[in-house]
Structures are given as structure tokens and as C-alpha cells.
Amino acid sequence: MSFRINPLNAIDFYKADHRRQYPEGTEYVYANFTPRSSRLANMLHDFDDKIVFFGLQGFIQHFLIETWNEGFFNQDKATVVSHYKRRMDTSLGEGAVSVEHIEALHDLGYLPLKIKALPEGSRVNMRVPVLTVINTQAEFFWLTNYIETVLSAELWKSSTTATIAFEYKRLLTQYAVKTGASIENVVVQGHDFSSRGMSGIYDAAQSGVGHLTSFIGTDAVTAIDYAEQYYAASGVVGVSVPATEHSVMCMGSEENELETFRRLICELYPSGIVSIVSDTWDFWRVLSEFSVKLKQDILNRTPNALGLAKVVFRPDSGDPVKIICGDPDAEKDTPAYKGAVQLLWEIFGGTYTAQGYKVLHERVGLIYGDSITLQRAEAILQGLEAQGFASSNLVFGIGSYTYNYMTRDTFGFAVKATWGQVNGVGRELFKDPVTDSGTKKSAQGLLRVERSQDGFTLFDRQSKQQENQGELHTVFENGQLCLKSTLDEIRQRLAQQLESFKDSN
């Protein structure tokens, strides 16, 4: 029997009995999910302090609908209730948590919750809620914050990944504009290499779609599946190319490495793009010696249906900036001193952009996916520009150091209740710890979010009529997904917001 998540148990234990801890007569609890601070985020120096909101629709469909239906509502009531009681009894103590409210929820047959949210793909200012949630039936007031644990766990990562992916795209777009490179090429310049370093394959899928909001280059196969299933993705969702790994090169043996390259280039992949890991033994020898011997084979490869016939060399170790742009401390005029891009230029030549920056011959290219961060990517692009090369000469492999070296605290995401109703009377709730720096101070009361010149602005302490206005729209209500966005629509929203960065340096 395979392991399945019981949605009732997707909580922290302390949530189980909060129902009794609320004041007698509690009827409604209203909470929000908000990025509070970028203090711990390792972003670029000119980061504008906005996150990309993404991931809610997938969470709603996968967890709030599918998992709850399959794991609770569609199961025999006596069975699921007894399982829940056993879990509570064995960990919290016999009879510590009653089950009548769980039985009532099963009888109801759906989650009596309403979630309002900003459009996915919005870039949202810090301390502005991206969503609110409230129970729709007074009997189930406890349910709003019962789902806090899973809502937070499932949403912070997708938004954080999408935010970082957008930052890579912003950086690449700015350098494409500066050096006259093709803007259309940027969507393949960030390639997702992160799957093997993520927290499980589901995490790789879910996070990987965050990458796909800004790029189409990916090796995360499951991310495309997730995008198709939960975001109606169609057309070009994600693309990759044939590529080798070190085991392939090692099996070919060091003494036959040149022949391994030749076989890959001429026999296995005589057309299209092929990426070959090139530092299994001596990267500089591959570029300065092997590529010269294989030059005519490389130039004679046949373009595929897309007109592509490129051999991509992949270094996978060392200092990325020095490998690509050259090491000024190396012996002068050696391959290490010149760097990979300059070496390929000397061997294969190329063309120039309208701004006068060099573009490698269309038959060769580079991809670097080891130890890439936003800061290293920026340093490489600066180095290429200084050497007179366009930014399009390199593809960045973005790995788990970027997409998994983060936490919920990267952007301070938190779920907080700000309003409730007890015996028919509303109560404005807020926290403001005297021992805190101000980051944990919450909004207060019912909330409204409006568009502003700088993104979005929060208005708290709103009336019910005011709360119904603004940019937060109902996306989930009483077990149903009410409003859908496709991946294409999300990409378009982000692309529109990218326009303002094209003229900035």
C-alpha cells in the first residue's frame, strides 16, 4: 500500500484543539497569507522588494479538492474518523481531541472555505497579502486556521521560486538590451537543473513550475506535467536538449575522449543541439585542442526543423566567472587566462550585434550550471560585456543551490488571522510583539488590496463592503475552484511587468 497524505493530518498538532480555545460563540475566522520581509533574501542589489505570487491554483486543485475528496470526503466516515481519533489519542492523550466536528465536516461533504487572491503572476509588494481565507459556515470557524500549516508549506516555495526566476530573467533581459542580444533568446537562457537537489520529486515539480513562469528551459520533466494538469499549460511549456553526463564521458574513457565527442557530434546527433559535459578531465584541452580538430564536423552539422545545429560545451567545475570570462591571474595567453568564450571566438568566430558586441558562431555555445547564483550570473554577464561579448553567448543552468537554498523566511511568508466574529459581533485582530523589530506586526481587521503606481497597496480595518472591493477575487469557495489562470496568462502578466526593466541598467 502506497503512502498517502491524510488531509486531516496535514497540520501541526497544536491546531487540533484550537477549536475549543477560541472564545465561546466564535463564528468566523478571517486570515491572510503575506510576504513580510526580504531581509534574508539573497537577491541582486537593485531588487525592488516585490515577490511573484504563484502556486495557489495548483494547491487548491491538488490538495484542497483532490486530496480532501480522495482522502476524506470520499472515504467511509467511520474509518477516517477512527484513524483521526487514533492519531490524536496516541500523541496527545486519550480523548484529548473530540471528533464530533470532524464527523460534521464529513457529513457536509466539502470544505466550507472561501479564498480570495490576487491574480497569479502578480508582482506584490512586501507586507501586502496575496490571499485571504474565511470559513463560509459558522459551525466550521475552526477550519480557517486549521489549514494554515499546509497552506503555508505548499505556497511559500512556489512563490519564492517564481520570484527568483523572475529576477534571473530581469537580469538577463537587461544585459540583452545593453549588448544588443536577442530578447527572444532570454526564455531559454535560464535552464532549470534543480530537480535532483529538491526536497522530493513532488517539490521538484511544484517548484519547477515557478521557474517556468519566466523561462521555458528546463530539465524538470515533472514540472511540465504539473503545469499541464493544474495550469492548463499548452504549446511550448518547457524545452530541453540531448545532453551527456560524466558517466557517459567516463565510459568512453579518457584516451578516447576525442572520439566520444566525434561520435556524439557526427553519429548520434548530426543535427539540432547537443550539450556535452566537457570538464570530465581537461576542459581547456577540449576547447583548445578537440574543438579545433572537430571544427569542420561541428560546422557541417545539419540544422534541424528549427534551424538549429549547435554544439554546446558544458564546463561543470571551478570558478564560473573565471571559466567563462578568463582568469586574470593565470599565465598570460593560456586558455585559462582567455576563458571559454574568448577561446571559442578565436576558433569559430561569429557575428556582431547592432551595438557592436560579439556573438559566437551559431554552431557553438556554452552552458554553465555549477554553483550559479544571481550574483555569479551578474558577474559573468558583466565580464562578458567588458570583453565585448553579448549576453546571449551563455545559458545558465539554475540548480538547487538557487531553488532549494531558501526557506519560508526568505520572504517572511506567514498566515495570520486579522478578523473574527463572536456572537454576531466582529473583532479586529492583530499582533504587535514588543520584543520584535516590527516585522511580525500584523495587519488588522478586514483587508482590501488595491493597485497602485508602485504595485499593490494594503488597506486594513475595512468594512465588509470595502472588503468586497479591490483586487482580491474569489478563487475557491465551498470545495470548488471558481477562477482559473493558465500558465500562458501568468507568463503574459509577468512579461508585461518586465517591460519596465528593459530600459534600466
Curated annotation (Swiss-Prot):
Entry EC no(s): 2.4.2.12
CDD domains, per database record: PBEF_like
One BP term from GO: NAD biosynthetic process
NCBIfam families associated with the record: PRK09198.1 (NF006629)
Keyword Transferase: yes
PANTHER family linked to this entry: NICOTINAMIDE PHOSPHORIBOSYLTRANSFERASE
Transferase found in the keyword field: yes
Deletion phenotype: The nadB-nadV double mutant can grow only in a minimal medium supplemented with niacin (nicotinamide or nicotinic acid).
Induction record: Repressed by the ADP-ribose-responsive repressor NrtR.
Alphabetized InterPro entries for the sequence: Aldolase_TIM, DUF5598, N/Namide_PRibTrfase, Nicotinamide_PRibTrfase, Nicotinate_pribotase-like_C
Gene Ontology MF, one: nicotinamide phosphoribosyltransferase activity
The name this protein goes by in its record: Nicotinamide phosphoribosyltransferase
Note: The nondeamidating route is likely involved in recycling of endogenous nicotinamide (the product of intracellular NAD degradation).
Its job: Catalyzes the condensation of nicotinamide with 5-phosphoribosyl-1-pyrophosphate to yield nicotinamide mononucleotide, an intermediate in the biosynthesis of NAD. Functions in the nondeamidating salvage pathway for production of NAD from nicotinamide. Displays a strict preference for nicotinamide over nicotinate substrate.
Reactions mediated catalytically: beta-nicotinamide D-ribonucleotide + diphosphate = 5-phospho-alpha-D-ribose 1-diphosphate + nicotinamide + H(+)
UniProt family annotation: Belongs to the NAPRTase family.
